[in-house]
A protein has these predicted regions:
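N-terminal anchoring/stem segment of glycosyltransferases
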Residues: 1-66, 151, 196, 225
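Aromatic-acidic/polar surface patches that form glycan- and anion
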Residues: 14-25, 67, 136-140, 178-185
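Catalytic phosphate/metal-binding cores of nucleic-acid and nucleotide-processing enzymes, i.e., regions
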Residues: 16-18, 23, 43, 80, ...
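N-terminal cationic-hydrophobic initiation segments that often serve targeting/anchoring roles
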Residues: 33-34, 78-79, 103, 193-194
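Short, polar loop motifs at secondary-structure junctions
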Residues: 44-51, 97-99, 206-207
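GT-A fold catalytic core of metal-dependent nucleotide-sugar glycosyltransferases
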Residues: 60, 70-124
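Conserved catalytic core of nucleotide-sugar-dependent glycosyltransferases
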Residues: 104-166
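Catalytic core and acceptor-binding pocket of nucleotide-sugar-dependent glycosyltransferases
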Residues: 139-228
């Protein structure tokens, strides 16, 4: 599909047995529109629905999807976005302040996968509890929850690589220390960034954009789930 608008936010929402990610995406869209009423938002989902006051575009995955591992469909975002410049966001997030300045920073690259995360005190997270495979394999500390790309050969190469890793996971898994049984998007993005070149698709020196991560060991909660 060819882009029909210059820039916008793409929210990926595939419902699972345990989580209604489409509902999460609606809340995220509301927070984006609160700060930026004119922001353009596209919902990418496997559940048919019409555009509305929250979603200017609704797209279904353009290729057959992997039902066993919903993460493995992520490479399709490159082909599904209606925007020439896209910021992809995970559905289970909130935007708590203006983010329009992100575009200026991110345009320094054709692709930018966010690096590192912060705790609820807005400090760089120090816990590496969830990042053993990254540290053991010297992978870039990327978080796909915020990913930017513009229509370009570099972005196409990146997402072709992402697809290749997902579809050939046993071969990649065999090369890793402490590998995951099923590939997570963060690990796949980290491997893809290593292949394409971290200097090409990450900006670890930048203070933003980063997510505030609310996992137990990052926020030093005593139990999991900490909201109970």
């Amino acid at each position: 599909l060819k882009p029909v608008e210059e820039q916008g936010y793409l929210i990926v929402a595939t419902n699972t047995a345990n989580t209604d990610y489409v509902n999460c995406s609606e809340t995220l869209a509301k927070t984006i529109k609160y700060w930026h009423p004119n922001a353009r938002i596209c919902l990418l989902t496997n559940h048919a629905r019409e555009p509305d006051h929250l979603f200017d575009h609704v797209r279904e995955f353009p290729f057959p999807i992997d039902e066993a591992n919903p993460y493995a469909n992520d490479w399709q975002v490159f082909y599904a976005t209606p925007f020439r410049e896209t910021i992809k966001l995970e559905a289970d997030m909130l935007i708590t302040s203006p983010v329009d300045h992100w575009w200026t920073m991110l345009r320094h690259r054709d692709v930018v996968v966010s690096t590192g995360c912060r705790d609820w005190k807005d400090q760089r997270a120090k816990s590496r509890h969830y990042r053993q495979v990254f540290d053991a394999n010297n992978l870039p500390d990327v978080y796909n929850a915020i990913t930017y790309w513009r229509l370009s050969k570099t972005a196409q190469e990146f997402f072709v690589t992402v697809r290749n890793i997902f579809e050939n996971w046993p071969q990649y898994r065999a090369m890793l220390k402490f590998p995951e049984a099923a590939p997570s998007t963060d690990v796949v993005y980290a491997i893809a960034a290593t292949i394409v070149g971290p200097e090409t698709c990450t900006m670890p020196f930048a203070s933003y954009p980063t997510i505030v991560h609310m996992k137990r060991h990052i926020i030093a909660a005593k139990r999991d789930p900490w909201v109970d």
